[in-house]
């Protein structure tokens, strides 16, 4: 028998999580005065008047570095809990981490050979 009251706390939590950002955006939208004008669409340059067009296109190499950084940053997030509980997890977890690191190294070598890490 399916008891729906078991999930009441989940639904309340979900409702609160959805309503808090909506409430915050609604309050600022209605409470703040409207600010229309040409200054609204310009970029802020630490008080200095912007020179030229401020909307520039970034080269793809910046995105590749950001992508590689993100991958290895997430790897660190996965490896830290494993490292803190290394002795309790045993040999199977050690082999899994070795496979995980090996896959990341293969990806890094592939990106390196494709020139994704070349700056010039």
Curated annotation (Swiss-Prot):
Q: What is the membrane topology noted in the UniProt record heading this document?
A: Multi-pass membrane protein
A Gene Ontology biological process term: photosynthesis, light reaction
Q: Return the broad EC class.
A: translocase
Keyword line: Chloroplast, Membrane, NAD, NADP, Plastid, Plastoquinone, Quinone, Thylakoid, Translocase, Transmembrane, Transmembrane helix, Transport
Q: Does the keyword Plastid apply?
A: yes
Q: Which residues cross the membrane?
A: 7-27, 63-83, 89-109
What are its E.C. numbers?
Answer: 7.1.1.-
Question: Which family does the UniProt entry place this protein in?
Answer: Belongs to the complex I subunit 3 family.
Q: What is this protein called?
A: NAD(P)H-quinone oxidoreductase subunit 3, chloroplastic
Q: Which organism is it from?
A: Adiantum capillus-veneris
The protein's gene is named ndhC
